[in-house]
Amino acid sequence: MEYPAPAAVQAADGGGAGPYNSSELLEGQEPDGVRFDRERARRLWEAVSGAQPVGREEVEHMIQKNQCLFTNTQCKVCCALLISESQKLAHYQSKKHANKVKRYLAIHGMETLKGETKKLDSDQKSSRSKDKNQCCPICNMTFSSPVVAQSHYLGKTHAKNLKLKQQSTKVEALSKRLTNPFLVASTLALHQNREMIDPDKFCSLCHATFNDPVMAQQHYVGKKHRKQETKLKLMARYGRLADPAVTDFPAGKGYPCKTCKIVLNSIEQYQAHVSGFKHKNQSPKTVASSLGQIPMQRQPIQKDSTTLED
């Protein structure tokens, strides 16, 4: 039996640990365009996917070398906003960030290098639409079937990551005008507060966010929102509208009574509790009225004592 030469085995294995390393034999067989893309991906892999940076100097070096992916105020790979220096260092040195970078490169490694984007022709654009059923570039996830992909795109995780990506785009636009990263974060918070006022983007009653008005309309006619409206009307009926406990508790988590510091599971339990003696005894109005009756009870006693002395 004949065994292949060690050089041939090394050439077949690729000669390296990285997924984008290629042998001279493969490079000789590949077209120029494919070899160029492979070289770009290999350079990006070496620049980003090495060991996790340790210390401030390595983190700053990584940011300067890959400004298309990382900045001092945001990580485009993780869709994370970095509002302080300590948060920036902790994020870029974390294992979670390193794993997401590897997944990002597995999807985008052939397309991105130092801010350059490949120009796609019509065929590539049509293939990109088909790739949506295979992977989600926003969440860095892969799918086994179009059904799983559609379920992901309609889920909360994708909506949350899409919102974070939109926020990171706003941060990038603001950072071009504002040099102070902390001023950028405060300005972004102001924009977020304005969005929370828009009912097509945020439901203050259920603490839910929406990507488009159609999704918002579906929420407002849904069972969850109607249940919250019923709860609010019930609170108002029993004099609880001005109680901040209605908004302090998470949406859909029972019926809170801040006076007694308990949460009831149903409307019937809440009605029975509010009508009961224990709740009325703990009510501030009852305590105030009982305190006001104390001097009224002492006055007739004093008058009786004076009449007896006379």
UniProtKB/Swiss-Prot annotation:
SMART domains noted in UniProt: ZnF_C2H2, ZnF_U1
Biased segments, Polar residues type: 283-292, 299-310
GO-annotated cellular components: cytoplasm; nucleolus; nucleus
Modified residues (N-acetylmethionine): M1
Ranges in coiled-coil conformation: none
Chain residues that bind Zn(2+) 1: C75, C78, H91, H97
Source taxon at top rank: Eukaryota
Principal subcellular localisation of the protein: nucleus
Keyword terms, alphabetized: Acetylation, Cytoplasm, Isopeptide bond, Metal-binding, Nucleus, Repeat, RNA-binding, Ubl conjugation, Zinc, Zinc-finger
Pfam (any one): zf-met
Region (Disordered): 1-33, 278-310
Cross-link (Glycyl lysine isopeptide (Lys-Gly) (interchain with G-Cter in SUMO2)): K114, K170
Extent of Low complexity compositional bias: 1-12
Entry keyword annotation includes RNA-binding: yes
GO molecular function, one term: double-stranded RNA binding
Annotated binding of Zn(2+) 2, by residue: C136, C139, H152, H158
Zinc finger (Matrin-type): 70-104, 131-165, 198-232, 252-286
Subcellular location(s) of the protein: Nucleus, Nucleolus; Cytoplasm
Biological function: Binds with low affinity to dsDNA and ssRNA, and with high affinity to dsRNA, with no detectable sequence specificity.
Domain remarks in the Swiss-Prot or TrEMBL record: The zinc-finger domains are required for binding to dsRNA, and also for nuclear localization.
Subunit structure: Forms a heteromeric complex with XPO5 and ILF3. Found in a nuclear export complex with XPO5, RAN, ILF3, ZNF346 and double-stranded RNA. Interacts with XPO5. Interacts with ILF3 in an RNA-independent manner.
Protein name: Zinc finger protein 346
Species whose genome carries this gene: Pongo abelii (Sumatran orangutan)
Gene transcribed to yield this protein: ZNF346
